[in-house]
């Protein structure tokens, strides 16, 4: 049985959070299991280096020989292992029915276990080797991570919007070698004014500040700091465009709809019209109402039928009569119009499926919510301190009356076409690139508003997307570390949602948030393509740091010695069709 330790006690082997005193030494579950399995299975390891490899939280599974030697050096006792009790492998256990003890459910215990310690060693521990107490400790260790990322996101907004002396880095190499601004005292306050620029095109100004802080933000993660330089460059350039798009979408306030009320024509006046072509007139007026988006009365269809029948009676064509005498009209039987059964919605905010496309049964006109098909908005929300971007900055090259909330951005033809600028013209706007703008609004900004992202959810999604194990160029050891970090962050996000929502709502919201990742990467890929064209044709002056992070770094002396090239200095390299 492990001995309880004071909160915050670190593992003597890897400096991770210790879960107890195992084999006479305060250690984490990963090192405890590694030590036990290495001795029980009589494992023999070989060091590929000089037998002095670093053993810490980030790279503890890189060299198992040095890790085992450090376990012995810190005092782990071989004699404390009880072979009969410390069984390795599958152990059949009775099913536990008390789900409350799991604090989040059995289904996610494996994800939470892998993420609790940030260990890149995924195969050292199995669900059978974990007990209920270990899972509880792991769950509780996830909460400080969410709090830290939320604080980090708030400080990011503070430095981005209020810090007037924030300077961009000259190169990506300088940015990676400099200390992170988030690990230094912050001189600005929330009471300071928002930083302004005199340029008409404000987005390049904000983007160079975003990229500078983005690199400082990445350096706050210990897993990132432990990576080799080449892998750091690969991770920064892989997520740079996605980071910019997400920040711009999250920090842009929503414009309210303009208060324009159109008065609807009075329906009785339309009915009593005695024009020569009353039926067509009523139909045309009603059609104009529908086309203008007005709120038409529910009985409009019956109104049209009644007007047409009355006009036909006046002309004597319904029953084969040529006379229009009032006496004949009074004696003619008027057929009763069969109305579709009306279903009154139980709640407000419902819409009825259309029935005007052919003679559909009345059952087809069922009531559905107005937001049917859209994800459910969260109830946490974000603070107004993050809303300082001006939404009109995204309207450069668009009509002055554009409203990001009112108009659909699916149709590219809505935007005004921009004239081609000569290579010497440097005043063209990046936001005027129509495909990038529309994709950013449709794929990122609108879903963010529909989901009503909270600061914690946004911060966790940023970190999850940053630690992408599929980043091109990562070596195998770095990829294992990145996988473990991403699994930990995924567990933190799910744990946070479980605390804020009921189980079903938490699962649905977790899926909705994670499913945003492919769309964000799709918009980022389109953004990179546009930047490549602008840079190649010299249509726009791009900040050097933004160019390096989005298009790839320029080869520096250090990179040339390491055999690393770049794609932004000189000619651009486009993939061939065979690739």
UniProtKB/Swiss-Prot annotation:
In this entry, the residue ranges of the DNA-binding region are: 8-83
For this protein, the record's InterPro entries field holds: HNF4-like_DBD (IPR049636), NHR-like_dom_sf (IPR035500), Nucl_hrmn_rcpt_lig-bd (IPR000536), Nuclear_hormone_rcpt_NR2 (IPR050274), Nuclear_hrmn_rcpt (IPR001723), Znf_hrmn_rcpt (IPR001628), Znf_NHR/GATA (IPR013088)
Q: Which UniProt keywords apply?
A: DNA-binding, Metal-binding, Nucleus, Receptor, Transcription, Transcription regulation, Zinc, Zinc-finger
Would you tell me the Gene Ontology cellular component terms?
Answer: nucleus
Which residue stretches are annotated zinc finger (NR C4-type)? 11-31, 47-71
Q: One short Pfam family name for this protein?
A: Hormone_recep
**What SUPFAM superfamilies does its record include?**
Glucocorticoid receptor-like (DNA-binding domain), Nuclear receptor ligand-binding domain
Region (Disordered) location = 87-128
The reply on keyword Zinc-finger is: yes
Q: Where in the cell is it found?
A: Nucleus
Question: Which PANTHER family does this chain map to?
Answer: NUCLEAR HORMONE RECEPTOR (PTHR24083)
Protein's name according to its UniProt entry:
Nuclear hormone receptor family member nhr-47
What is the native source organism of this protein?
Caenorhabditis elegans
Taxonomic lineage of the native organism:
Eukaryota, Metazoa, Ecdysozoa, Nematoda, Chromadorea
- State which gene encodes it: nhr-47
């Amino acid at each position: 049985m492990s001995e309880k330790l004071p909160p915050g006690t670190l593992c003597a082997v890897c400096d991770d959070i210790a879960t107890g005193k195992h084999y006479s030494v305060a250690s984490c579950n990963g090192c405890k299991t590694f030590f036990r399995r290495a001795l029980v299975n009589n494992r023999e390891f070989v060091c590929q280096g000089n037998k002095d490899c670093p053993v810490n939280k980030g790279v503890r599974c890189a060299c198992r020989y040095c890790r085992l030697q450090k376990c012995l050096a810190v005092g782990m006792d071989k004699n404390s292992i009880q072979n009969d009790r410390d069984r390795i492998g599958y152990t059949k256990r009775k099913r536990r029915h008390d789900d409350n003890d799991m604090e989040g459910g059995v289904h996610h215990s494996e994800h939470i276990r892998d993420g609790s310690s940030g260990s890149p060693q995924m195969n050292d521990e199995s669900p059978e080797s974990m007990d209920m107490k270990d899972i509880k400790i792991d769950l509780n260790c996830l909460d400080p991570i969410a709090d830290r990322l939320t604080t980090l996101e708030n400080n990011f907004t503070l430095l981005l919007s209020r810090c007037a002396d924030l300077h961009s880095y000259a190169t990506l190499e300088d940015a990676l070698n400099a200390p992170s601004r988030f690990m230094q005292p912050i001189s600005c306050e929330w009471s300071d004014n928002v930083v302004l620029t005199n340029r008409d095109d404000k987005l390049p100004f904000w983007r160079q500040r975003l990229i500078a802080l983005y690199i400082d933000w990445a350096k706050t993660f210990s897993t990132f700091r432990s990576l080799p330089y080449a892998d750091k460059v690969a991770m920064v350039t892989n997520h740079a465009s996605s980071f910019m798009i997400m920040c711009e979408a999250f920090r842009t306030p929503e414009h309210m709809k303009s208060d324009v009320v159109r008065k609807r024509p009075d329906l009785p006046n339309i009915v009593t019209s005695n024009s020569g072509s009353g039926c067509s007139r009523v139909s045309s007026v009603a059609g104009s109402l529908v086309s203008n988006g007005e709120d038409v009365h529910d009985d409009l269809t019956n109104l049209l039928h009644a007007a047409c029948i009355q006009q036909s009676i006046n002309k004597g064509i319904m029953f084969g009569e040529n006379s229009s005498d009032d006496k004949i009209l009074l004696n003619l039987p008027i057929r009763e119009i069969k109305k579709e059964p009306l279903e009154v919605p139980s709640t407000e905010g419902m819409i009825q499926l259309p029935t005007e496309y052919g003679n559909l049964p009345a059952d087809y006109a069922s009531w559905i919510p107005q937001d049917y098909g859209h994800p459910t908005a969260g109830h946490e929300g974000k603070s107004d301190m993050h809303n300082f971007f001006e939404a009109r900055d995204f309207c450069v090259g668009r009509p002055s009356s554009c409203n990001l909330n009112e108009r659909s951005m699916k149709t590219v033809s809505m935007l005004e076409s921009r004239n081609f600028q000569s290579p010497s013209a440097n005043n063209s706007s990046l936001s005027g690139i129509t495909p990038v703008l529309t994709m950013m609004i449709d794929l990122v900004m609108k879903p963010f508003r529909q989901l009503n992202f909270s600061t914690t959810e946004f911060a966790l999604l940023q970190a999850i997307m940053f630690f992408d194990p599929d980043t091109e160029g990562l070596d195998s050891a770095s990829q294992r570390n990145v996988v473990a970090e991403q699994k930990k962050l995924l567990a933190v996000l799910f744990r946070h949602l479980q605390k804020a929502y009921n189980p079903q709502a938490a699962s649905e919201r977790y899926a909705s948030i994670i499913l945003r990742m492919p769309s964000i990467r799709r918009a980022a890929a389109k953004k990179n393509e546009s930047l490549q064209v602008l840079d190649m044709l010299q249509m726009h002056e791009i900040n050097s740091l933004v160019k390096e992070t989005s298009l790839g770094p320029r080869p520096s002396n250090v990179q040339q010695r390491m055999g690393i090239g770049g794609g932004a200095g000189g000619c651009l390299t486009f993939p061939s069709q065979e690739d």
